Amino acid sequence: MLAVFLQGFALSAAMILPLGPQNVFVMNQGIRRQYHLMVASLCALSDIVLICGGIFGGSALLSRSPLLLALVTWGGVAFLLWYGWGAFRTAFSRQLALATAEELKQSRWRLVVTMLAVTWLNPHVYLDTFVVLGSLGGQLTPDVRSWFALGAVSASVVWFFALALLASWLAPWLKTQMAQRIINTLVGVVMWGIALQLAWQGASL
């Protein structure tokens, strides 16, 4: 059981650790200390749903529906281009100001919607959870499949909370205008790079 748990944990961690839309968003909110634990919780919860869905049968749905995959892919491209543009606009604005407490209060639901879009409109999430984890987990016998799923979701929960807390701890050094310009530029580059990669993949669907 422990070996299967560790296998799920290691495989999930290997797919979560690379810099992607989810990680960038959680890190950014941690630096701003702007509902970062809520964002980490929602990211982890979304991953739990996706991972369990993939391992316990959802991988077959995605493999049988090229249209669904295409819709998710192009929706993701559009969203990532929009999000990246916002990051570039912030990075190169003449006056870069941190949000006030009142602005943070008003933007909570916008953050929730953006986080859900970052997760659920990212085709890589479905490929990781449904195709990779789903295919491997589906090959296991029912008595150990749950341990594989538990290991996979544990990696997700640990990672997102660790990233949010670490970014929050480093916030005093990363909240300067220069650091924010650099971070937002990197966010824009990552988002547009992933969008172009997805567009290339979507053209071949």
Swiss-Prot record:
Lineage, broadest ranks: Bacteria, Pseudomonadati, Pseudomonadota, Gammaproteobacteria, Enterobacterales
Protein topology in the membrane: Multi-pass membrane protein
Pfam families with a match to the protein in the record: LysE
Function (record text): Involved in the export of arginine. Important to control the intracellular level of arginine and the correct balance between arginine and lysine.
Protein name (Swiss-Prot/TrEMBL): Arginine exporter protein ArgO
InterPro entries per UniProt: Arg_export_ArgO_enterobac, LeuE-type, Lys/arg_exporter
Family: Belongs to the LysE/ArgO transporter (TC 2.A.75) family.
Record's catalysed reaction(s): L-arginine(in) = L-arginine(out)
Transmembrane segments: 1-21, 37-57, 68-88, 112-132, 147-167, 182-202
Keyword Transmembrane: yes
GO MF annotation terms: L-arginine transmembrane transporter activity
Compartments where located: Cell inner membrane
Gene field: argO
One cellular component (GO) term of this entry: plasma membrane
